[in-house]
C-alpha cells in the first residue's frame, strides 16, 4: 500500500513539473523579443526556413550588442522580431541613425519583422544605404505597430529610399501590413478576410523634404 502511495505521489510531482514546464513554454512563446535599433544597426536573415538577427555595437570592430543576460546578439534565431527605438528608462521613442537590413535569401524564404514605434533617420552620405534595406529573392513582411517614422536625408552622390527594395538587391517581395493590434494580438477580420478595427499602425517614410505617409489597414 505504501509503495502505491509513493508511486501516486511521484506521478503527481512529475505531472506538476510537466505542467509548470508547459506553462513556462507557453508564456515564453507569447512575448516576442524586442530589439532596440538605437543600440546598434540590425541585420536580419531568413534562410532555409528559419530567421535570425544580428545587432552590431560596432561592425568595423566586430562587436555585438548584448542582451539583458550579457549574451551577444549574433545570428540569434528568432521568428518574431520586433524592432523599437524606445528609451527603456523613460519609455520615450528616440530617433536613431542606425540602419536595418532584412534579407530573405531564397524564393521560398520569408522574413517577418514588426516595427513598433521606431524612429529611424539616416543621412545617406554617411550610411551609404537607405534606413531599411530589403534584400534577397524571398518575401519580407513588415508589420506596423504604433507610430513609425523612417526617413532619409539624400546626398546627390548617395540617393536611397527610406525603405529601399531594389531589383539589384534581389527579386523578392515586400509587404507592409497592419494585421495585428499593438499588443501583438490578431485583429478581427472583415468579410473579405482583411484586418479591421483595433489599433492602427502608421508609417511615415520618405526623404526629409518629401515624405510619404503609409497607413496600416483598419
Where are the language model's segments positioned?
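Bacterial Sec-dependent N-terminal signal peptides
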Residues: 1-17
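A composition-driven surface/loop motif
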Residues: 12-16, 27-218
